[in-house]
Amino acid sequence: MNTKQQLVFIMADYRLGLFVFRNDLRVEDNLALYEAAQRSETLICCFCFNPTQNKYGHYGIPAMGKHRFTFLQQSLKQLRTELEMRGQKLIVLTGTFDRILTELISERQVDAIFLSQHQGYYERLQLGLLQQRFPFLPFHETPNNTLFSEQELPFELADLPETFSQFRKKVEPLSRNFSVQPVNALPSLPKNISYPGFKAETLNELASDDFEGGERAALTHLTSYFSGESAGTYKQTRNALDDFSSSTKFSPWLAQGCLSVRQIMAALRAYETEFGENESSYWISFELLWREYFFWYALKHGKRLFAFSGLSGKSPKTSFYSERFQKWCSGNTPYPIVNACMKQLNATGYMSNRGRQLVASCFVHELSLDWRYGAAYFEQQLIDYDVSSNWGNWQYLAGVGADPRGHRQFNLEKQTERYDPDNEFIERWAGDLSGQPIDSVDAADWPVR
């Protein structure tokens, strides 16, 4: 550590800071970590993993499946390496968020908590309970996963536009320098650090899926994407069902925070400076604004993000049919394009945006199922699960969210003709199950003959 860095830490506001990683598993352009580094003489960096996520979740569906768990483990391993390169250490502790932090704060006599702003209702509820337990402890929650902070929005959060189009028209004119914040040095760990009563999680060596978790992999992909031709053809290819280069594929790293949306926008602006703006580069920023909108949408509406009636106040005319749900999950419906998409999801943890729209539309309209079960299954399976984008988009498709039309049904036959005219995708994922009935029993559980 050089003299300048020592001076910064000696003049710090707090003797011991605690930084809690959540959906911000990176060091570079981590504004919350940067604030913790500037204001803490010594620092503990931790991540709380609740193993019940692999067993329990909404509607009896485990919240985290194998693909996202593998990606998370890879991301944590890379984060640990990045921190060690800066003289720090990542402590991964197993247990509930509330119990771990309560004991850690008390036992280590932590002076301040630093973490990134989270849009999830339950994550905010957990943090609120912790703040009530320690009312005199400073909690510093930094906007870290959006393009704009709440103060930079041209409206109060309570006045967030009801539709994306209205939101986009208000925020697109905002002038913003999307520079990134390097974090080159971190305060040291406190001396004689130990964690009695905690179980430290071992990060195992795991085989890589199609996506490799971690900050280094994210930055490598970011550089590669804007160095090639894909960014110039994004608008034309983004709806492809099964081509890795057809869309940006930033979403898994964005979801875990291995990559910041500011880093993507900075790279996009650099690309436009070198090659010029075009329709495709605009559509990349357009899709990032969708993500931005759903972040603030979730923050504004809180628990209503998970409500059956959503924002509409009117419950959809759907229900829950166990057999239909299981067939949809396994890709065993009368709809080949849906089957192929679901089998792709189950095998890889990923599905194209177009595929997600088709299977969600089928779930709600053809199968007449409660949209929340579909959202919960996506939460389990998707490697790029993001609470606001996932549940917000499902509300949108179910007609109870931010869609001004209130009804978003896709004609599956026409969509197949348009996006898989030669049935290549369906054949690749064995989606054609001709003659497969929707039900084998009726509403009273009598066999259908």
Swiss-Prot record:
The keyword Transcription regulation applies. Its cofactor is FAD; (6R)-5,10-methylene-5,6,7,8-tetrahydrofolate. Pfam families: DNA_photolyase, FAD_binding_7. Residues 15-147 form the Photolyase/cryptochrome alpha/beta domain. GO terms for molecular function: DNA binding; DNA photolyase activity; FAD binding. Coiled coil: none annotated. Binds 1 FAD per subunit. May have a photoreceptor function. Binds DNA; probably functions as a transcriptional repressor. Belongs to the DNA photolyase class-1 family. This is Cryptochrome DASH. It comes from Idiomarina loihiensis (strain ATCC BAA-735 / DSM 15497 / L2-TR).
